[in-house]
Each structure stands twice: as structure tokens, then as C-alpha cells.
UniProtKB/Swiss-Prot annotation:
The gene is rplA. The keyword Isomerase does not apply. Coiled coil: none annotated. It comes from Pseudomonas savastanoi pv. phaseolicola (strain 1448A / Race 6). This is Large ribosomal subunit protein uL1. SUPFAM superfamilies: Ribosomal protein L1. One of its GO terms (biological process) is regulation of translation.
Amino acid sequence: MAKLTKRQKAIASKIEAGKSYNFVDAAALLTELSTVKFSESVDVAVNLGVDPRKSDQVVRSATVLPHGTGKTVRVAVFTQGPAAEAALAAGADRVGMDDLAAEMKAGDLNYDVVIASPDAMRVVGQLGQVLGPRGLMPNPKVGTVTPDVANAVKNAKAGQVRYRTDKNGIIHTSVGKVGFDAVKLKENVEALIADLKRIKPASSKGIYVKRITLSTTMGPGLVIDQGSLEA
């Protein structure tokens, strides 16, 4: 068995095995345990009572967190005409059509979100092999294919998170940064859980939100007592 590092021993000494933590206490403990020199993300994993092998139980959506994620989000938009002007005014980092597609094919993919108006999908459709593997392909299910590109840009910049159940029925997303006020982190997670409940598949039976785990980029995962959340 590999030996634990000093940092791992210090972390292990402060975590109670099998405990479900009050959310605010968990956020405070994760901040205390963060010793890295960069601003770690605070992430949440939510185990859902779904069978992701069934297409009608794949949970996929997007929601704007009330306090954002603390990340700077670069947004590219495929559109033209007045919509292009509106997207730029809303804060898009790059707007274009065939010219933008050519840049992306050449390897310029320094974007976190790609948005497209429906009329631009003839161009975006050529980029499936480029954008798909990076999770950047616009999709109407998460609001990135829309006639209202300006609003989509505002949402992305405001801290919208996009999520989808993995093969184990778990969704993973960032909900802030270490150093965020614990109450703001809590409200972000509550907004996410409320959105998950809103789109609960009708065919999902039994307990829907089974487990919520909070962690940092380099830190441990703490199971959250769902009774400490208002969602």
C-alpha cells in the first residue's frame, strides 16, 4: 500500500469517515484543507436515481447559478446580422460564421462555451469532430442553440453551468471557488438541485437525489447532509 503524504495525512486526520456534513461546515472544512497555490474550484457531484442506459432517463440541462462560478468564461457565437451585433454587445468574445469556423478548424479553440443561432447550424454542423470531443458543440437542450444568442451569452458570462449524467448516473459541475462565502456556495448548490428536480425524468422511480458530494480540485470529497440544504 502506498504511503500517505504529509498533506494526505493532515487531511485524513480532519475528516470523519462515514459522516454527512452540514453544508456550511463542509465548505469551511474544504477551505481549511486547501493548501495549493492556485484558486481551486469547488465542485459538486450529485448521484441521481436514474438509469442512464435508458434514453428517457439521461438528465441534461443548464442553469445559471445565482452567484456564478468565479471563472472567466470565453464565449464564441456563430450568428450574423443584427444578432451578431447583439451578441457582441452582450459580451461575446468572438462572433462570426464561416470565418470563425475556419479559425476553429485551424485549432483556435480557446473558448469555454460555443453558441449558435439556428440559421448558423449549417456552418456549425461541419465542426462536429472539432467541437464534439471538447464538449463545445452547441445544443438546444442546454440553450446553446437559440435565436436569442444575446441572452445565451449573458447567461454564460453570468455563471451558467451545463451538466449531463455520466454512465453511473452522476452529474458533476463546478459551483464556485475556494474563498467563496459559504452561504453563496450553498445557494449555488441549492439552485442546481432545484433545477435537477425540475427536470426529473417521469420514469425515474424511488429516491431521485441519492447523494451530494462537495469537493475541491485537489481536495477530498465530503458527503453533504441534504437536510442542511433548502432545495
